[in-house]
């Protein structure tokens, strides 16, 4: 009986506590990671109106995306921001640094998936819904009835990014006015 109890306890530690500890450690790594020298400069070349504070805000949005991927159990996520996707693309070009980042942050390589909006394609919707959920939770926003957008979903609109994705937390008023082009945060909570 003592052996069985010890083995059960060991299984709990190895199966529950260690993975949670590792996830928390990886999340802290993502939050505090120092970007490679010159990365934000490269983003600013693509977006000449950006000041360093703007690039830093975009980098916070990219961190939010990486955290959503990690906290979802490394399940498929879609990038909801064009400007954060631009920074992700630049980061990938620092191949050694990106590979090392992925190994420490996720335990393996995170392949790039293009920025997308809510669509007819179920897999893309699942990825957007997942990143919406975790970004909302990260910022203490109710994902079903949001009163504001999480940073990652607000970036393109904030910076008026060409071909960017514009989201609204709640589109009831927009729909009443006949605007069907808006992407609505509350729609991400819909399971359909």
Regions found by a protein language model. Name each.
Residues 1-192:
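Acidic, Ser/Thr/Pro-rich intrinsically disordered cytosolic tails and loops
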